[in-house]
Amino acid sequence: MTKSIYIIIGYMLHDEEFFYFFFISFYTLWIVFFLLHLSFFSTLSFGIFHDFDTDVYIKVGNYILHFLELSKNSNLLKNSSEMLKHFRLASLMYMYVYTQMICPSLLGIRN
């Protein structure tokens, strides 16, 4: 699963059209998933982070550092204005951390 996430992020960093397609589809799916999660599993929605230990912050930090390493030579980020660059980087970083930590927790998968 991790390898496929790296491939998707690599495409997103080098192809602007793919970035917008994936960005829109990811957030649409995330909103639908979140609404379903709240409606059917309301007791779990407040317990997403209960399974995380204190080293969760170290894990998030490592994911962010690894993501920044992946995005260092990105064509998409080089050709952007400064404000748009920060927005894209923050969005990609959020998706990366979300898929690495929150989704496995919701599905009951331990890293």
Curated annotation (Swiss-Prot):
Bilayer topology reads: Single-pass membrane protein
**Cellular component, GO, one term:** membrane
Keyword Transmembrane present in the record's keywords: the answer is yes
Q: Which UniProt keywords apply?
A: Membrane, Transmembrane, Transmembrane helix
Q: Note the superkingdom of the native organism.
A: Eukaryota
Q: Mostly located where? A: membrane
Q: Where in the cell is it found?
A: Membrane
Annotated transmembrane regions = 18-41
Instruction: From the Swiss-Prot or TrEMBL record, give the protein name.
Output: Uncharacterized protein YHR130C
Native organism = Saccharomyces cerevisiae (strain ATCC 204508 / S288c)
Lineage here is: Eukaryota, Fungi, Dikarya, Ascomycota, Saccharomycotina
